[in-house]
Amino acid sequence: PAILPPDWVFGPWISANHWNTQKETEKQIELLKKYQFPATVLVLEAWSDEATFYIFNGAKYKEKPNGAPFAVGDFDYSESAYWPNPQEMIEKLHKAGLHLVLWQVPVYKQQGDDEIRNHQNDLDREDAVKRSLCIHNLDGTPYKIPEGHWFPGSMIPDFTNPETCKTWFGKRQYLLNMGVDGFKTDGGEFVCTDAVSFYDGSTGKESRNYYPQQYTKAYTKF
C-alpha cells in the first residue's frame, strides 16, 4: 500500500541558493511572519562545505578515516562565519513551524584546482575506492563522471551495495540527530555509459535510468 508522507510535506516550501549563512536563514523566519506566508518547509541549498556535502560550512572537527561516522558533538562551530550554532537555528525553525531540508548530491567529489583541499573528502574518496563503495567501470576501476557533465571527475556511490548505504548514511545520521527533517535529493543523472558495473550485478544498460531511483530509494529508507 502507498504510504503518504507527513502533512508538512504538502505545505509551501521556500528556498534560495544565497541562503548560505545562519543569519540569512533566520531572517526568513521574520520575513514569513511579516508577509504572513504559511511555509512549512525551508530548504537549504548552500549549507555544506561543498566537498563532503554532509558537514556544515565552517565547522572544525577531527577528520575520520575508513568511513567512520560523525556524532553531533564532533563539530565546533564557534569560529564559523557561516553557521555559528546550527543546532540553535534548527530549534528556531521548528519553533516557527518550519521543517528543515538539506540539499544533497550523490558524489564523492573531485575538487577543482581552484578549491581549498578538503581532507575529509579525500579520506572519503580513498575509502570508497578501497572498499568498492562506488560504481565501477567494467575493468574494475572506479567510474568517474565524464567532462562536460555536472561534477566531472567525481565518483558516484553504489547504493546497491549495503556497505555503501551503511557508510554514506552513517555520515549523515548526526544531522537527523540534530533535528534535520529531510534531504533534497538533487542530481543523480550521472551514469553516462552502459559500460559500468554495480554491486548487485547490473550494468549501466539497466541502471542509466534506474540509478536516480536507487538514490532516492536509499534516502527514503534512511
Predicted regions mapped to residue ranges:
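Catalytic-domain carbohydrate-binding cleft regions of carbohydrate-active enzymes
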Residues: 1-222
